[in-house]
C-alpha cells in the first residue's frame, strides 16, 4: 500500500533568507503536524532548513531525498513551487526528471472560494485587515496561534484582572483589537473562554505588539505553560 507523506521545512525558507521578515507564519510546525494528522497523512517529515541544506542542488534534492530516501512515486506540487540552491529547480525541472527517477508530478488545481484562489497570502491579508470570518473560511478552521505564557508586568493581576502574556513569535497577526477567544492548554482538552487584547501598550511606552488573554472563571498559575 502506498503511503502519503508531506515534507515541511523549518524554518520556512522565505523566513530563513529574509531575517527581517516578521509575523509571517500562519501556523507553527506543531500545528501543521496536527492538522495533517487529521487529514490521514501517513508520515510527516520536518526538515531543518539551514545554511548547509539551502545550498543543495535541485538535482541532488530529487536524487537523494525524493528518489533514494523516500522512493517517491507521485509528487504533488503547486505551479509556483521552487526548490534547490538559489531556487534553481521548478515544476518543469521536476517533470523533466520524471522518467529517470520513476515518479509522476501532479499539480492539483487551485481551490476557489467565491471566485478567489485560496492562498496563504490572501489569508494573511484577511487577518491583517481584521476580516476574521473570511480568514477562517479560507483556512477551513478557526484561526489560532500557540505560544508560551510569559511573565509580564503583572499590572492586571494587581487590579484584579490577571492576564496571560503569550509569546507570539513570528505568527502573522490579526488586526490589533479586542477579541473573544477560546484557549486550550497543552495536554488538557478542556476549553477555557476568555477575552484577548492584541496590540500595544502606549501608556507603558511599549512598542512591541503583545497578546494578552484574560480567562473567565479561572484561577491558577500558567507561567511557562503552553
Name every feature range the model reports, one short phrase each.
Residues 55-163:
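Classical nucleotidyltransferase
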Residues 151-226:
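Phosphate/ribose-recognition catalytic cores of enzymes acting on nucleotide-derived substrates
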Residues 15-17, 55, 86, 207, ...:
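Generic domain-boundary/flexible-linker signal
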Residues 3-5, 43, 74, 104-106, ...:
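A structural signal for isolated positions on well-ordered beta-strands in alpha/beta enzyme cores
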Residues 7-9, 47, 108-110, 152, ...:
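Conserved beta-strand termini and adjacent loop/short-helix elements that scaffold enzyme active sites
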Residues 2-68:
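Core alpha/beta nucleotide-donor-binding catalytic domains of modification enzymes
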